[in-house]
A protein has these predicted regions:
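AMP-binding/adenylate-forming catalytic core of the ANL superfamily
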Residues: 1-65, 74-75, 80-84, 88-92
């Protein structure tokens, strides 16, 4: 699974301002896909929105590529050049 494909799909959703997709430990599969989403200003984090984002992915890409979980964050950790600190996100889970 390429994170960029899942991220590009989620970025098309109007509630998503920025997103990072990371692999996290999973007892059943060894690792599963998690999306960490920074919302647009008018969107509000909720369980319903998390389910909507997973469903949105399933309508646009193969189910096995879609995140199993979605977490919301105020600001994704990026350096001055805009590069994502992906390991910081993975370490949080």
């Amino acid at each position: 699974i390429y994170p960029a494909e899942v991220e590009a799909t989620l970025l098309e959703h109007p509630a998503v301002k920025d997103v990072a997709v990371v692999g996290v430990p999973d007892e059943e599969w060894g690792e599963s896909v998690k999306a960490v989403v920074q919302l647009e200003g008018t969107a509000h984090a909720s369980d319903a929105l998390a389910l909507e984002l997973v469903d949105y992915c399933r309508r646009h890409i193969a189910h096995f590529k879609c995140p199993r979980t979605v977490d919301f964050i105020e600001q994704l950790p990026r350096d001055d050049n805009g590069k994502l600190y992906r390991r910081r996100l993975q370490g949080a889970w």
